[in-house]
């Protein structure tokens, strides 16, 4: 169990930072969208290519599920 818990604890400990950084970056993206609602074509194309709206919605969910997963593993 120690061989599993030790690396999982590293991941779990860093997820709180990843959540905070993600939240901050997504807030910044929202500010850009608010103040620059009509970006250049290159930015529009890139946003469509990476499906930015889905990414903004899904990334926090992914991080949350990773948090739950590491908590469950550490309870084993």
Question: Could you say what each language-model-derived stretch is?
Answer:
Residues 3-75:
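Histidine phosphotransfer helical core of two-component systems
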């Amino acid at each position: 169990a120690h061989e599993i818990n030790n690396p999982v604890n590293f991941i779990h400990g860093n997820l709180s930072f990843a959540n905070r950084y993600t939240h901050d970056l997504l807030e910044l993206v929202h500010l850009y969208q608010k103040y620059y609602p009509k970006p250049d074509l290159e930015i529009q194309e890139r946003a469509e290519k990476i499906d930015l709206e889905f990414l903004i919605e899904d990334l926090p969910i992914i991080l949350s599920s990773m948090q739950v997963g590491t908590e469950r593993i550490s309870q084993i």
